[in-house]
Amino acid sequence: EQQIDKKHIDIQGLDVGKVMVQGDKSLLHQVIYSVFVRCHTPEGTFHALERDLDRIRALGTDILWLMPIHPIGIEGRKGTLGSPYAIRDYRAVNPEYGTREDFLHLVGAIHARGMKCIIDVVYNHTSPDSVLAHDHPEFFLRDEQGRPARKVADWWDIVDLDYSVPALWTYQIDTLKQWAAIVDGFRCDVASSVPIEFWERARREVETVRPGCIWLAESVHGAYIREMRRMGAACSTDTDLYRAFDMTYDYDLWPCYEAVLKGKTPLCQFTDLLTYQELTYPTGYVKARCVEN
């Protein structure tokens, strides 16, 4: 069995490349509309969301991004309903939203209106009581006492996955391929904390199921990258992420953007940074421009 060095996350024999993907520049002109199913309608269901699709399309929406649609963990849950980013089962839909058939019908309705559908992929971590934690405890990061661990202390409702385990790669990619048979792409949560080599392999394999699959990375603030690296954890920069993703977040400009809005920084500094992006990122890069996450 091929092994992954746990200390350095140096990938051996996994046939990963080191080149940037040729991104789809048409994404520059497309509008992504984010929906949290629980809060979008009074009912908080897939079926109820369907009734709003015509309005969403009329806004000029090209891509509908559904925040996590999966069952939420109970152990360590934040609040009564829990965070959708503490996922219990990657391969199921949250029964509070409806059935799998309801989800399939929703995606069909999205497509019928000329929009694409992408779903959230939360592959850095799961809930402590997840299916994977029960069936594959070897997939998880451990502390010195052998207990499931996490790198970000105040994310107390999750435990981190350990991508030095080759079998985890296979499970996760198989899951992506299952969803790629239904949806048009993925918004990948805290993508920087999952090895870029994993995302490269995932993209190649998903392409066999969904040619032209959309890949949006939630890249991270510079402060997060510094902290992860200080801890000895791998963390990809935006430039790294373009080896596998079509789009990254605009976090690299957000401190300046917020300062401009507050009148603390002249607009010219922000436009200078936009130019710097053109000089820094690979040809064909796309940034997801947004006012907040």
Where does each model-flagged region fall?
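Active-site-proximal helices and loops of the catalytic beta/alpha 8
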Residues: 174, 189-287
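Catalytic cores of glycan-processing enzymes that make or break glycosidic bonds
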Residues: 6-8, 210, 285, 289-293
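Short, well-ordered beta-to-alpha junction loops that form the rim of enzyme active sites
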Residues: 69, 121-122, 190-193, 219-220, ...
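Hydrophobic faces of well-ordered beta-strands that scaffold small-molecule active sites
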Residues: 31-35, 64-66, 117-119, 186, ...
